[in-house]
Swiss-Prot record:
Enzyme Commission no: 2.4.1.21
Species this protein is from: Fusobacterium nucleatum subsp. nucleatum (strain ATCC 25586 / DSM 15643 / BCRC 10681 / CIP 101130 / JCM 8532 / KCTC 2640 / LMG 13131 / VPI 4355)
Keywords: Glycogen biosynthesis, Glycosyltransferase, Transferase
InterPro entries assigned: Glyco_trans_1 (IPR001296), GS/SS (IPR011835), Starch_synth_cat_dom (IPR013534)
One annotated GO molecular function: alpha-1,4-glucan glucosyltransferase (UDP-glucose donor) activity
Segments crossing the lipid bilayer: none
Gene: glgA
Annotated SUPFAM superfamilies: UDP-Glycosyltransferase/glycogen phosphorylase
CDD domains found in the cross-reference section: GT5_Glycogen_synthase_DULL1-like
Catalytic activities: [(1->4)-alpha-D-glucosyl](n) + ADP-alpha-D-glucose = [(1->4)-alpha-D-glucosyl](n+1) + ADP + H(+)
UniProt-annotated binding residues for ADP-alpha-D-glucose: 15
Function noted in UniProt: Synthesizes alpha-1,4-glucan chains using ADP-glucose.
Protein name: Glycogen synthase
Signal peptide: none
Family: Belongs to the glycosyltransferase 1 family. Bacterial/plant glycogen synthase subfamily.
Length: 461
């Protein structure tokens, strides 16, 4: 079984979000645990450190026709932890300050999609399946069909439907160079007067997955379908969810007791050292999607509950300013770390008591699973992957490894948080919840097995 995993990013080479984590951990697990010959292909961004590419081997180069001109494409190969990574080299498109968000992203990533299809002769790797991820690789199924390559199956995984790769429709002829009459239609790339790259993956791939079972159902609704819920209803027969996992090796556990880790964290971040005060944390991109408006609305009430609060994240300035001001108002009780620090994030997971994640929607989410590994109990809104990975605690049965609320509003969030704090002040109960959280298997083993089964099913037809 040969699989080519096409992605816009992969840790440790380049990462802007959860896709980078998945593109590292899933192929590694499929290779090591399921014996799948899987290789990863991504752009060779100038942001990738020379140290990571020092052993890169140049496999070859050629010119491909893109946007009405010939364009150089080179392929370089690096092996990491048993997985081969191919890098699509072109300085015109990928020697940029940003991974995404450039003025010509349309041309950059249609080039990438074409290059994936056109360089199999260079890699000498003919896959049974190309596994595409998000809009950056969503045109690959189209270019395979345009080239008449029908013996390579395609899977398209949606990591976040909100990002669809919208562009003006004139690029169909000007850049994509495909038949407008054939592809600019509702059951094609058309999205109102624009085109959506992501729709290419949805319509033309052989199978669609999302990153959790619940999210696969949610994108069929008007509320969370981002304008194409009808398309997912139509293609329901080839759609399913497979919840992500976490790479446990990336999150090593400390041998120190929690109370020491908590005290160390409090000292490091300038909080009063208070062993019995519930320490509530959020580690997130500061974006409305993450439910931050609920926290802003109820922040004064939260602080009245006798808690400490840590924020680690960066994003919208209005949130950055709000949380920075709260640190000023609540010296010794609030720390707002605007930015991101991997080492600090691990210390926060290990030293905190409650992880707050009230997302408006969440395709999967990794933070809640990382928190549970460290015994930091998640309080989440029951949506998408949060619903699938956190079982709300039931004090009558003793079952559950976190706390959840169903409706997307601030009142339900604060009500659930109060209940979690109430349980926190019952030490025996709280230790039972921690025990439940730590024993939950959030590894990549089960998801990798499900993907292998899906690959096998598609190959067998």
């Amino acid at each position: 079984m040969k699989v080519l995993f096409a992605t816009g990013e992969a840790f440790p080479f380049v990462k802007t979000g959860g896709l980078g984590d998945v593109s590292y951990s899933l192929p590694k697990t499929l290779k090591q645990k399921e014996n799948v010959d899987i290789r990863v292909i991504l752009p060779k961004y100038s942001k990738i450190s020379n140290e990571l590419l020092k052993d890169a081997r140049h496999l070859g180069h050629k010119e491909i026709w893109v946007a009405h001109h010939n364009e150089y494409v080179g392929i370089e190969e690096v092996e990491l932890e048993g997985v081969i990574y191919y890098f699509v080299d072109n300085e015109r498109y990928f020697k940029r300050p940003n991974v995404y968000g450039e003025f010509d992203d349309c041309e950059r990533f249609l080039f990438f999609c074409k290059a994936v299809v056109e360089t199999m002769d260079i890699t000498k790797f003919k896959p049974d399946i190309i596994h595409c991820n998000d809009w950056q690789s969503a045109l690959i199924p189209i270019y395979l069909k345009e080239r008449g390559i029908y013996d390579v199956k395609t899977i398209f995984t949606i990591h976040n439907l909100r990002f669809q790769g919208f562009f003006f429709n004139n690029v169909i002829e000007d850049l994509l160079e495909i038949d407008r009459a054939k592809y600019f239609q509702e059951d094609g790339l058309k999205y109102y007067d624009m085109i959506s790259f992501l729709k290419g993956g949805v319509v033309y791939s052989d199978y669609i997955t999302t990153v959790s079972d619940s999210y696969a159902e949610e994108i069929k609704t008007q509320e969370l379908g981002e304008g194409i819920h009808g398309l997912f209803q139509k293609y329901d027969y080839k759609l399913s969810g497979i919840v992500n996992g976490i790479d446990k090796i990336s999150y090593p556990l400390s041998k120190k007791p929690h109370k020491i880790l908590k005290a160390d964290l409090q000292k490091k971040l300038g909080l009063d050292v208070e062993e019995d005060t519930p320490l509530i944390v959020i580690i997130t991109r500061l974006d409305r999607q993450k439910g931050l408006d609920y926290i802003v609305e109820k922040f004064d009430e939260m602080m009245s509950l006798g808690i400490q609060f840590i924020l680690l994240g960066t994003g919208e300035k209005r949130y950055e300013h709000f949380f920075a001001y709260q640190e000023y108002l609540h010296k010794g009780q609030v720390c707002s770390y605007i930015g991101f620090n991997q080492e600090l994030s691990t210390e926060i997971y290990a030293g905190a008591d409650i992880f707050l994640m009230p997302s408006v929607f969440e395709p999967c989410g990794l933070s809640q699973m990382i928190a549970m590994r460290y015994g930091c109990i998640p309080v989440v809104r029951e949506t998408g992957g949060l619903k699938d990975t956190v079982k709300p605690y039931n004090e009558y049965t003793g079952e559950g490894d976190g706390f959840g609320f169903k409706q997307a509003n601030a009142d339900d969030m604060i009500k659930t948080l109060k209940y979690a704090i109430k349980m926190y002040h019952r030490p025996n109960v709280w230790q039972e919840i921690i025990k439940n959280a730590k024993k939950r298997d959030n590894s990549w083993d089960k998801p990798a097995k499900r993907y292998k089964e899906l690959y096998q099913r598609l190959i067998e037809g």
